[in-house]
Amino acid sequence: MPTFVDRVVLHATAGDGGHGCASIHREKFKPLGGPDGGDGGRGGDVRLVVDPSVTTLLDFHFHPHQRASRGRPGQGSNRHGADGADLVLPVPDGTVVLTEDGEQIIDLVGPGSAFVLARGGRGGRGNAALASARRKAPGFAELGEPGEQLDAVLELKTVADVALVGFPSAGKSSLVSVLSAAKPKIADYPFTTLVPNLGVAQAGDRPPYTVADVPGLIPGASEGRGLGLEFLRHIERCSVIVHVLDCATLEPGRDPMTDLDVIEAELAAYSADLSDRPRLVVLNKIDVPDAAELAELVAPELRARDLAVFAVSTATRRGVHALSLALADLVAQHRAAAPARAATRIVLRPRAVNEPDFTVRPLGDGFLITGSKPERWVRQTDFTNDEAIGFLADRLARLGVEKELARLGATAGAEVTIGEVTFDWEPTLSGGGLGNGGLGVDDHPGGDGLAETGPGGRGPAGTAASGAAPSPGRGGDTGSSVSLGPRGTDDRLRASVRLTRAERMARRAAAVVDPAVRGEPAGRGEEEG
């Protein structure tokens, strides 16, 4: 079972928004209580937060699917649903978030830095929020918007001050163990170290610094040979690079200078940014016979390259203290020159400047409508409710969708796709008639431009349908005007019907008691915008 994981694929799902509620207030002696359906709660976000106590992505290796809680639905009596709890995922310092194609999204460095990986869906508005002067008691509510889903690649680039690089069995793990209190696995065979080992070193009264032992590099590591490609990224953030050269190994074609040139070539091939990092050279294992003489032989040539050289024995700890002091000074210089990083909370939701509300383009024999507003409106519409469909049609008409379809030559019956929903378009005779009626009320047969609308266009029973016979008026009483016939036509029939106050109250009461609005949650929702 792995104990160190530095790359995982995370499947994050934010919480859905809670559904809005369609409810009518019921109280003794209040026959016209009005709508009182509450809004649904917002879904929880999925957030990544840097936690200094976390050093690996192991938890996500075993649990790659993470889901936040959804918002609670609204209820009657204007009770709003509770928001879903955010899902906070602790990640190590230095975690990079990538798309599946390898494009970097964000680089999280610094304790407390946070990133909203998936945003929760908006809660749906209840019918109390949807009421207007023309729509006194809406018989529908909005649906909760689904939470975002994202598959992201998390990569850990260790945040270490000093990186030890070198060939396998050069003594890097042994050097970490004497510089710090870390206890890495040490053995006398190549590739003993399979994961980076981190240690915290303290040199005298200098500030502490971190040391990372990178698994052994071999020629071709930057191209994927050996283990180098998997762990070369852990060198990217280091302040100082330390070449650990083995002075005791006698192999054909290998010597300290050759090893140095090979490792430098691999670092340059991996990233040009590493060329400006300060470097030190450690000539290791000088306690072995003949190793000290070899170290003295190559030291002048290394110094000629402007490299600081330290002859070290991890077995006897000779030269270790001087090396630690030099590393502490270099790290302190780098920290003083680097700008301080502050913990940040990042939410990336870029939007183009002057982005249109919607676009219409041909799609086969039909048309495809894209845009954040129409797509969101479709997601939050309850297509089992005729009144909700009429409300959607009015919103699209006011946005200018019908006029744009007519301009592009759309004919009756053409398929119009918005998001995941496809409609059969039924244009009004004069075009643009959708914007002339009441908000969310379809008082004409088929005149809302959407084939889903039910007979008569009105949703709940008890409301006047197209073609209904006007009630006889009573002279002298204050009345209200009822619009009959297809909306948006040139020969629209308007009949002014004089109704007594008692008759108007009776009609409103009939609409209020309609079975479609019994106070149960009827939809899901979000905020209009």
From Swiss-Prot:
Q: Which InterPro entries match?
A: G_OBG (IPR031167), GTP-bd (IPR006073), GTP-bd_Obg/CgtA (IPR014100), GTP-bd_prot_GTP1/OBG_C_sf (IPR036346), GTP1-OBG_CS (IPR006074), GTP1_OBG_dom (IPR006169), GTP1_OBG_dom_sf (IPR036726), OBG_GTPase (IPR045086)
**The protein's Enzyme Commission number:** 3.6.5.-
- Cite the entry's keywords alphabetically: Cytoplasm, GTP-binding, Hydrolase, Magnesium, Metal-binding, Nucleotide-binding
Q: Where is the composition biased (Low complexity)?
A: 461-472, 508-520
What cofactor(s) does the depicted protein rely on?
Mg(2+)
Q: Tell me the Gene Ontology biological-process terms attached to this UniProt entry.
A: ribosome biogenesis
Q: Binding of Mg(2+): at which residues?
A: S173, T193
Q: Which residues form the OBG-type G domain?
A: 160-332
List residues of the OCT domain.
350-427
UniProt xrefs under Pfam families: DUF1967, GTP1_OBG, MMR_HSR1
| EC class of the enzyme, as a word | hydrolase
Its subunit composition reads: Monomer.
Record-given protein name: GTPase Obg
The taxonomy runs:
Bacteria, Bacillati, Actinomycetota, Actinomycetes, Frankiales
